[in-house]
Amino acid sequence: MSFLKSFPPPGPAEGLLRQQPDTEAVLNGKGLGTGTLYIAESRLSWLDGSGLGFSLEYPTISLHALSRDRSDCLGEHLYVMVNAKFEEESKEPVADEEEEDSDDDVEPITEFRFVPSDKSALEAMFTAMCECQALHPDPEDEDSDDYDGEEYDVEAHEQGQGDIPTFYTYEEGLSHLTAEGQATQERLEGMLSQSVSCQYNMAGVRTEDLIRDYEDGMEVDTTPTVAGQFEDADVDH
């Protein structure tokens, strides 16, 4: 395939953790041949015997896992899903943000499978992948976890220093939502109203019917028991 190119394999300077020879590479079900898989901290690379191969950047890798399905014709292998599209006519993988002419919003996905001849090496390959992937966290996940607002210094405010942070009321907050956020808000409100009006069943009988029958047809004597009321009852000794 034309996207295969010649490049030097990653070495110790790039944090090479695992070098697995005799590994078959499969792209979207199409075999690329047998070569060497290089799992480095900087990138994931595969090169065949002629020196042609490809590299995957960790930020584009959305999933990696071990496939233990022996019924698969490939057998046990390392599975890697990439958020990029590899095309025969292109020299480089086309990332999602570069597909401006796409007619839909479907994110491109490419599946790689690496099948080593030595199946006992799969665990070490997977562990090396986990370690390298952890060095390249998703920026979107980091942004969602971090609070990007200004810190509110209570002590400074009490001394008349610093600005009061801006808060939105519920209505004002809705006006700042994006179209997607507003759609999500409406969907959540619909789910909430549906759950409130939902009638729960108990042994096939609606609980509200039980409560109504209980209130209409059953009287409960709330008169407190007087001490000594049953003192004249027979008691077996």
Swiss-Prot record:
Coiled coil: none annotated. InterPro entries: ICln, ICln/Lot5/Saf5, PH-like_dom_sf. Its main location: cytoplasm. GO terms for cellular component: cytoskeleton; cytosol; methylosome; nucleus; pICln-Sm protein complex; plasma membrane; spliceosomal complex. The keyword Zinc does not apply. It holds the Pfam family Voldacs. GO terms for biological process: cell volume homeostasis; chloride transport; mRNA cis splicing, via spliceosome; spliceosomal snRNP assembly. Component of the methylosome, a 20S complex containing at least PRMT5/SKB1, WDR77/MEP50 and CLNS1A/pICln. May mediate SNRPD1 and SNRPD3 methylation. Forms a 6S pICln-Sm complex composed of CLNS1A/pICln, SNRPD1, SNRPD2, SNRPE, SNRPF and SNRPG; ring-like structure where CLNS1A/pICln mimics additional Sm proteins and which is unable to assemble into the core snRNP. Interacts with LSM10 and LSM11. This is Methylosome subunit pICln. It comes from Pongo abelii (Sumatran orangutan).
